[in-house]
Curated annotation (Swiss-Prot):
Residues 1-396, 450-476, 532-860 are cytoplasmic. SMART domains: HATPase_c, HisKA. Pfam families: DUF4118, HATPase_c, HisKA, KdpD, Usp. This is Sensor protein KdpD.
Length: 860
């Protein structure tokens, strides 16, 4: 017995795999969307149902509202209907969707009309779309209908147009999550004609409907809303396709408007102007703020917050990018977003001002690359500092030029005009002021050069004897030396103050960026979304999260976004290491400065935390699955030991009785003991057969040969096998089985079908010992339905699906009633043959098991 038990445990090795991997594939949701009642949504749904029925799909109708329309009711003919469930409320009975009946029937496709319907109080779920979610979770495809006025996000707009508040609403995300949304469109004039002909409402309601809700203006507005809403969904699908296929070329499939803001007083005007431009072409509006990487041109958080609130209220999205050259950063972002129009602010500038600084707008227009640029003027923009808009390279060159030009200009003015009015002290003060100006512009080094040049010019042109490098008076020498020393000292102080100001602004901007990225994580963004935000902010071609495990020669790509991403550290333009070098954030694009790397190091740490958090969640899920598998394995071992112990004990008692010499058994007693032994062996044989079949199913080695199988022959062979005791020991119950399958033929594997029927009939005989078991069959379109019906105790409602789980038997509350693999094996065999099997209540009591198999293409 020990060896047999070990062998059986070995047989169940594949069960761990099966338990961990058995999942139910979620059904698909298809929605017919309409602008108003009567456009033909239900009619289109029924037409799709007939097309699927012609292809051999198992389609049933659970809820179809015909509203008294004859054409719709006629189209419902030929479709199996699941009766509604009636709910009593305030003395009346209301029909509702019977979710449990749908789950018991378990068709491939079910029709559920009016997805936004509110269920009668007392129902399990308050809304019908929640019922549909349960059906989808069971792996059943649902086809439904929705009117645009029922979308919760558009409810107030529809009420404003029609003057009618819609009580029944459905969240927008439910409809957006549908696998397919098809618009059923009809012109307002055609819909009004249909209404006038009585094809929508009864005759007594037509006049009121035409003069109220179904006015031409209302229908036109609702139609436009429906078309625009669906266009948004198509656009989202297109963006997903472009991202999946890594397409970067601009597709002007839709207008997109980008507006650049600084956070200053002109920003709100720019956003409103861009919103008007976008609304005229129904374009998407994006607001972008460029953060200067050098820390200049900072803006306060409250100012930028007001711009963000305005953008959100206008339906725009807010974006932040980093770049030292603002026009380049704007154009890169616009191209990345596939924008067609760019709105920038500009100020009125004099000719002299344009000579030194063209302005961001003018520089942006020079290289738009196919993007239409709108330059909007605003009085407040003229007060902005032009120096802060200069790039670091331009500012560096300008400061060194100022170090040469400012002392020269001061010297020329002093020699030509001021020398006659001022002494050496006043002239030194002028040069001192010039050095301070250079220090403010460029820092210590240009200021030192300016101080040196100032001293030389002061000595040569303004100190006696003039036009020589000789200093005759000691006071003049001291004055020049003090000038140089004080100029350099003050330049150091000024440069330090300016540096601290820039650092403070840079720190504020870094904090703003960190808050931006941290906010994405807190809002539940996944790793790919975070990397996309990094790529967008720093104008990178691609961003990759790489993991280099200890001892590995190559890295593992955890996630990547963009085109042509880096796959190793050496090929990256910018590489950010995290912690112990296990994670790297790799960037392909422009090389980032050290100041940007500080922020990215913190972001990369957040990204690594997301990876580890995801891994911990997966490990927790695996641990839970293993725990469930261990629990099921313990249940299996307990059940197997019970099923083995009972027949072995009976056989042992019978053999011991026959071998005893103390009692002389009559021939009848001997025959009975031998029958007990045979019956026990039959039970063991059936148990081992089911175990082996389950093991084969778990290993995926079942390869059915589908041919024409005559059900009369299959049922008779199953009854013979039961009578011989191959799968059970209720030989005396064979006469209780009534067969009425006629000449039905199914496409099946004859051997597997015999095993399925034998298991189901044997199960019915076991649990309905005093009742008739009926087996009947019939063809329904392109399917053959086989019913095994008993009138026994049945099972509690809602637990029918549990019968097909491994180790489950009717009425099980513990693991002491047996293995219960027969029904599980039956489902595995049926599904291997491309069919389905389900259980439902027998009217009057009992259990009915329905096998659904394909029918041959030609009728015999």
């Amino acid at each position: 017995m020990t060896l047999l038990f070990a062998d059986l445990c070995a047989i169940f090795t594949p069960y761990r795999w099966m338990i961990e991997h058995v999942t139910t594939k979620r059904g698909q949701l298809r929605i017919y969307l309409g602008a108003a009642p009567g456009v033909g949504k239900t009619y289109a749904m029924l037409g799709e149902a007939h097309r699927r029925l012609e292809r051999g799909t198992d389609v049933v109708a659970a809820v179809v509202e015909t509203h008294g329309r004859n054409k719709t009711a006629k189209l419902l003919e030929g479709i199996e209907m699941i009766p509604p469930r009636y709910v009593e409320y305030r003395g009346a009975r209301f029909p509702e969707l019977d979710v449990e009946a749908v789950l018991r029937r378990h068709p491939q496709v079910v029709l559920v009309d009016e997805l936004a319907h509110t269920n009668t109080p007392g129902s399990k779920n308050p809304k019908r779309w929640q019922d549909v979610q349960e059906i989808l979770d069971a792996g059943i495809t649902v086809i439904s209908t929705v009117n645009i006025q029922h979308l919760e996000g558009l409810n107030d707009v529809v009420e404003q147009i029609t003057g009618i508040e819609q009580k029944e609403k459905i969240p927008d995300e439910i409809v957006r999550a549908a696998d397919q949304v098809e618009l059923v469109d009809i012109t307002p004039e055609a819909l009004r004609r249909r209404l006038a002909h009585g094809n929508v409402y009864a005759a007594e309601r037509v006049d009121a409907a035409l003069s109220n809700y179904f006015r031409t203006g209302n229908l036109t507005a609702l139609r436009e809303i429906a078309l625009l809403w669906l266009a948004d969904q198509v656009d989202a699908a297109l963006e997903k396709y472009r991202a999946d296929k890594k397409i970067t070329a601009t597709w002007e499939a839709r207008e997109r408007v980008v507006v650049a803001v600084t956070g200053g007083p002109e920003s709100e005007t720019l956003v409103r102007r861009a919103s008007r431009i976008a609304s005229k072409s129904s374009a998407e509006l994006m607001v972008v703020h460029v953060i200067r990487g050098d820390g200049l041109a900072g803006v306060s958080a409250p100012q930028l917050g007001r711009v963000r609130e305005l953008a959100t209220s206008l339906g725009a999205t807010m974006h932040t990018v980093v770049g030292d050259d603002v026009p380049t950063a704007l154009l890169d972002f616009a191209r990345e977003m596939n924008a067609t129009q760019l709105v920038v602010g500009t100020s009125r500038r004099s000719r002299w001002a344009r000579l030194f600084d063209e302005g961001i707008g003018a520089r942006t227009v020079q290289e738009p690359g196919g993007i239409d640029v709108h330059m909007v003027t605003h009085p407040a923009a003229s007060r902005a500092s032009g120096w802060s808009r200069v790039s670091p390279r331009e500012r560096h060159i300008a400061s060194w030029l100022a170090a040469l030009v400012v002392p020269s200009v001061i010297c020329a003015i002093t020699v030509a005009w001021l020398d006659r009015f001022m002494g050496i002290g006043g002239e030194s003060a002028l040069f001192f002021i010039g050095v301070l100006i250079v220090a403010l512009l460029g820092g210590v080094a240009p200021a030192a050069l300016s101080a040196l040049l100032s001293g030389m010019l002061l000595n040569y042109f303004l100190t006696e004897p003039r036009y020589t490098w000789t200093i005759a008076e000691p006071d003049a020498a001291v004055t020049e030396f003090v000038l140089l020393a004080m100029a350099v000292a003050v330049a150091v102080l000024v440069d330090g103050a300016a540096s601290r100001t820039r650092e403070a602004r840079r720190a504020s901007q870094e904090a703003e960026l960190l808050a931006l990225f941290a906010g994405s994580v807190l809002r539940g963004a996944d790793l790919a979304t975070l990397l996309q935000r990094v790529r967008e902010t720093y104008s990178q071609r691609a961003v990759t999260m790489l993991r280099v495990r200890q001892g590995a020669s190559t890295g593992e790509t955890v996630a990547c976004v963009g085109t042509n991403p880096c796959r190793d550290v050496d090929s990256a333009d910018t590489a950010i290491e995290v912690g112990d070098d296990e994670f790297w954030m790799l960037m392909a694009g422009r090389k980032l400065a050290a100041r940007d790397r500080r922020v990215l190091t913190a972001v990369a740490t957040q990204a690594a935390g997301l990876v580890k958090q995801r891994e911990l969640a997966e490990e927790a899920g695996q641990a839970e699955a293993i725990a469930r598998a261990d629990e099921l394995r313990r249940s299996l071992l307990s059940a197997v030991s019970h099923d083995l112990r009972t027949p072995l004990a009976a056989a042992k008692v019978a053999v011991s009785s026959l071998r005893t010499e103390d009692v002389a058994f009559s021939p009848e007693d001997t025959a009975e003991l031998l029958a007990t032994i045979e019956e026990s062996i039959d039970q063991l044989t059936a148990l081992v057969a089911n175990l082996l079949d389950s093991s084969r199913l778990a290993a995926g080695v079942i390869r059915p040969q589908l041919r024409r199988a005559y059900l009369e022959e299959a049922v008779q062979r199953a009854l013979v096998s039961i009578g011989k005791g191959a799968t059970g020991f209720y030989r005396s119950g064979i006469d209780r089985v009534k067969v009425d399958v006629g000449d039905a033929v199914a496409m099946a594997d004859a051997g597997l079908l015999e095993r399925v029927l034998a298991n189901l009939i044997d199960n019915a005989l076991r649990y309905a010992p005093d009742c008739v078991v009926r087996v009947n069959a019939g063809r329904v379109r392109e399917r053959v339905l086989i019913n095994v019906i008993d009138e026994g105790p049945g099972v509690p409602r809602g637990t029918e699906e549990q019968l097909f789980a491994p180790f489950q038997r009717p009425g099980d509350h513990d693991n002491t009633t047996g293995v219960g693999l027969g029904m599980s094996v039956a489902r595995g065999f049926v599904e291997a043959m491309g069919g389905t099997i389900s259980a439902t209540d027998t009217p009057g009591g009992g259990l009915t098991v329905v096998i659904d198999l394909a029918a041959p293409e030609d009728r015999p």
